[in-house]
């Protein structure tokens, strides 16, 4: 709008970074002026609106007049489908560029030129896009089949183009209004049972498709909403409730660090992808949340391919004044996105803190076969990482990156989730439950049984983060006897030392210490430790497909059908830290556990062997070390040199009572998850 152009021109007078960015934009525009580059119509348009130099407008007009001579903007492969897909993402992008160019150069065109270009753009883009995705009787797509990022991109960019053409083509006004009325339905899509489609938006905010595609789909919708508001002054655009929760969602799935902002790369995303584009558009829509300013301030210019950066037209126009961005956001340190199965827990919002991210939800399309997988960011590095992804046509995508083998999960007889789930989806999804955060104690439960129910009847993974250790407890049961293995994707130097594995990357370092069902074999002479875990090094492609990297599998030699796994991930303050927690394996009647000693504190952790579903009507009472409880798992902490009976800090997982002698420490008729 003229107002936004005027605002940025005023800001340039006292913001050197904007002046520098404008220099880059003008240079790109001048190159496009010589080449008559359609793909730089946004640069040419901005250059004209800022400088009022008619050369840019004339170039835009020339480019558009040539563009509408094309027979089709369709894609050959898409057009060969039955029925033909007349529109796709490439057309959507062309629609946006055409809309920007047509609107910018409108006043230098004759009425006949306007009409010719408008009719051509309607034929090439508006009618195919809105016709395929929205309008009767030509619509071929539904929200159930293609209601993810493609829907908003194709229909909303087609809608923006229609908005720019409505002076010459009054008939498209009705199409625009139909789109405006339909847009909230995209946000509200509730999923379906018959085709195993996920609900698009979580009640806590955000979209299940991965950060990359969530941001893209939302960005495209917001661009149309802004364009509609700009062309309908004084009219109420209506409410889309999901928008209010997006700043929290984008922030909760990011990891602030020294250098570029990282984000969770579950599914088809990369850790350098960020959501500044959607955040800027939300801010422009009037959502003046300080969290948005904080988020945008974390993003490094140019850190990913499609961003709204200062030296690109949209970033130049929509980056707000960040001088009042808070140092840290006022957000909780944990977040459960239960509808699509993500959780994050962090020890602070400072840069280079520690964050644990867990996923157990739907599998389909951009959502990988990664039920119960996790990522650990520590001291600026995803020290335990996701395997990543690559370009979809490459065989490595379907054969590795999408599959369970590329994630930190448990396999049974070498199998994870069935490969067919990439196309057909997981009929039974994974879940996350019972997120607790009490500062130095955090917990979440992952249930990945459904996606691997062809082999498993129980696939539960508990994450209990106490002080500087994340305890990962696996409760596994299969339909038949076989072999279990634990996969680890690490990002750093991997060194086995006795029963521990040390992983280090710069200032970031963790120790991986398997404790149950067995320790890691103490040496390479694994034949001397026939019952202990042995390890396998597996080569896999790197994300850039330029080489290979190694991930690791810890194998249990025994053939069984029920296992309790317990692995400690020790978060080291420095790679050279020697004062690590001492962990003693302990067992008693119907329980296993640990005694952990560190820095004058003792923590006893107990896992109830009767509480894993093996009892039907009898309750799961155990009496470890003088305690009496039916809890699935519990922990008590107390100062070294004092008695456990005097403990004040308790974690109770799925328990109705905790007693000792004649004293009741906790009681509830129903089993609860409690930190007290």
Model-identified regions with their sequence ranges:
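Catalytic Cys-His active-site segments of thiol-dependent hydrolases/isopeptidases
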Residues: 384-389
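Short glycine-rich loop/turn motifs
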Residues: 149, 153-156, 339-342, 371-373, ...
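Carbohydrate-active enzyme catalytic cores, enriched for enzymes
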Residues: 138-141, 165, 208, 212-383, ...
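Aromatic-lined, polymer-binding surfaces characteristic
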Residues: 5-9, 13, 17-248
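Flexible, surface-exposed loop/gating regions in the mature catalytic domains
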Residues: 133, 147, 151, 322, ...
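CBM-like, beta-strand-rich accessory domains located in the C-terminal region of large
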Residues: 390-676
